[in-house]
Amino acid sequence: MKTGILFTSRNNYDLLDYWLKNVNTEGLFILNIDEDSTPENKIKGKEVCEKHCIAYMDREDRGMQNNITSACNIFKKSNLEWIIWFQHDCFPITNKFFTKFNELVETGKLDNFGSVGFNIKHDGVYQMLSRTPLQQPNRDMWNRFDINTPLPLEYNKVHSVESVSWMCAAVNINQYLKEIIPTGEYQFFHAWDDIAFQFMYKNIHNICIPFLELSHEQIIKKDFNMPVKSPLAKTEEETKKREHYYGKWGHHKVWESRWGFSYDDNSTFEEVKENYSGTLIDKFYNHNLNTGPLQIFEL
């Protein structure tokens, strides 16, 4: 196997234990990086990892991107080439999911891509193929389809995306270490979007593999007394609970300061579009989702 699995955990080890009990990881190496859990949760995390024979480490530097850098350096020593990262409430549903992905890795056909996303069956409602902050039309900032209808033919093929649906995301270790400048400013939210945009700025495609499917089951967090909708916090108590699991907020401001436009309003890209001329970022901004993918790949 040339693929490994990464978890980044913060005070959510009961959910990690549930995931590991219910998923056949097909013999892949698994690393869990703790993101400043409380002392009692660190103890629980070490116990869960030992129970399931997976590696545990405390973070080196804070934030998702720095954790991925740590994982890349560790995985590379074992000659692994790709990392698959999971949110703890996202579960593979394609039979032999990991084997099928690894077979693609071993063909070498993924070598030139940056990040890879999949078809995420979200809360039993949508098939979420990618995140689309720039493409037109921009109503939802997702490329998504009803879960009960077949995907349109053009989107049923491996295709280029702006940013992956990062309930589960894979990253090319060599490309990441070579091309990505990690920041600790994003502790969780928007970290993967920033990675995808860094790749696009270098004209490296991110792709969706729609025939590899997973189920994102947010409701399961209710069984572990976690916020079901992780970004939502309307009261001081809800804000503290969100930070307990995900770290500091403020990722929208970080995004705007780094990229020059608002993630939630692609009209603001007009002011900075000249900075991205000749890049995939510019190509996606001028692309309409309704015409099909920007580019299709045969794997």
Question: Where are the regions a protein language model picked out?
Answer:
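A recurrent flexible, glycine/aromatic-enriched loop bordering the glycosyltransferase active site
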Residues: T149-V171
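Conserved donor-nucleotide/metal-binding helix-loop-beta segment in metal-dependent transferases, i.e.
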Residues: K96-G114
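A conserved acidic beta->alpha catalytic loop
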Residues: N32-G45
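Short beta-strand-to-loop acidic/aromatic patch adjacent to the donor-nucleotide binding site
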Residues: L80-F91
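Donor nucleotide-sugar recognition loop
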Residues: S163-W166, K178-Y201, H205-S215
